[in-house]
Amino acid sequence: MLKIIWVILSIVLIGLIFLRTPQNQGLASFSTKSNLLGSPSSAEQFLNNLTIILMIGYFSFAVFLNFSI
């Protein structure tokens, strides 16, 4: 059961990382950048926090499954 949760968590984490937009898009991003000083918007901050939480969960499951074998 834990292995299934671990696989689902890894797939969701990979999908979340691929959905993220790149931070540096060259000189064209300066003209279209709406937020001053590069501060992330609330949605981007939420994605950052969600990614960190899922990574901690992924590594916790990896350590737990490694010791249970």
From Swiss-Prot:
The keyword Coiled coil does not apply. Its main location: plastid. InterPro entries: SecG (IPR004692). GO terms for cellular component: chloroplast thylakoid membrane. Keywords: Chloroplast, Membrane, Plastid, Protein transport, Thylakoid, Translocation, Transmembrane, Transmembrane helix, Transport. It comes from the Eukaryota. Involved in protein export. Participates in an early event of protein translocation across the chloroplast thylakoid membrane (Potential). This is Probable protein-export membrane protein secG. It comes from Skeletonema costatum. The gene is secG.
